[in-house]
From Swiss-Prot:
Transmembrane segments: none annotated. The keyword Nucleotide-binding does not apply. NCBIfam families: PRK00024.1, radc. Belongs to the UPF0758 family. Residues 141-263 form the MPN domain. GO terms for molecular function: metal ion binding; metallopeptidase activity. Zn(2+) binds at residues 212, 214, 225. GO terms for biological process: proteolysis. This is UPF0758 protein NGR_c13970. It comes from Sinorhizobium fredii (strain NBRC 101917 / NGR234). PANTHER family: DNA REPAIR PROTEIN RADC, UPF0758 PROTEIN YEES-RELATED.
Length: 263
């Protein structure tokens, strides 16, 4: 009977290579467990649970702005530590209002914010604006002035170009329509009084509130703002249409031209 050939003796260099390979795999596994906090979960999962519990038990007063933004980002970016992203967004845009009001392309310039996340943030901003706008429906707008300002600020304060908006009111001063009449450049919006009055007649509006933003952040009215407002008021008056106010929106405040008696 023929004996099988003996197994070759392992080469010392091959044995050393195998030991090194398996040692590296063990080290990598230990590093992964350490990164996951020794529990098989990423270290930020425990932080997320604690943050949610704090909000559930104590409400928003217990959270900083970056905590609130981080809670939102948890859902949008489930497999990543979102605290640095939340802090970077606030550093870039200043406030929660600034983050949600920022244009999509600027949001995407922040590391970790892709197109889908930017769109979701804008969707949240849209929901907030519509909520504020719904507060104006079927109400006398002049008796809900703070709601008007809140809505205009949410809709316009962080636009990067000037935007001229008109709130059309009926004889009860209830909101009929809210329309952006014109969009312009960073410091100018062309507005045509005849077109404003024409649209008011089409909607059977009897009163208007004019609003536009100053992307510079300073809501001080310019000479052109004052002259344009006077022209609209003069064109509307003979047709029984009242211009209640022209509000200029800045990032941190607003100016009522009626309050300053500028027209």
């Amino acid at each position: 009977m023929t004996k099988p050939p003996p197994f070759p003796e392992p080469d010392d260099s091959e044995t050393a290579d195998e030991r090194q390979f398996f040692a590296q795999q063990k080290t990598r596994k230990l590093d992964t467990v350490a990164t996951l906090g020794g529990t098989g979960e990423a270290h930020y999962h425990g932080h997320r649970d604690r943050l949610r519990a704090r909000y559930r038990e104590q409400g928003d007063a217990a959270l900083a702005d970056y905590d609130i933004l981080e809670l939102i980002l948890f859902r949008l970016i489930p497999r990543r530590d979102t605290k640095p992203i939340a802090k970077e967004l606030l550093a870039r845009f200043g406030t929660l209002s600034g983050v949600f009001g920022a244009p999509q392309h600027l949001l995407q310039e922040v590391k970790g914010v892709g197109e889908a996340v930017a769109l979701d943030l804008k969707l949240i901003a849209t929901a907030a604006q519509r909520t504020l706008k719904s507060e104006l429906r079927n109400k006398q707008v002049l008796s809900s002035w703070s709601a008007v300002i809140d809505y205009c600020h949410a809709a316009m304060a962080h636009e990067t170009k000037e935007q001229f908006r008109i709130l059309f009111l009926d004889k009860r001063n209830a909101l009929i329509a809210d329309e952006v009449q014109q969009q312009g450049t960073i410091d100018h919006t062309p507005v045509y009084p005849r077109e404003v009055v024409k649209r008011a007649l089409e909607l059977s509006a009897t009163a208007l509130i004019l609003a536009h933003n100053h992307p510079s952040g300073d809501p001080t009215p310019s000479r052109a703002d004052i002259e344009m407002t006077k022209l609209i008021a003069e064109a509307a008056k003979p047709l029984g249409i009242t211009v209640h106010d022209h509000v200029i929106i800045g990032k941190d405040g607003h100016v009522s031209m009626k309050g300053l008696r500028l027209f």
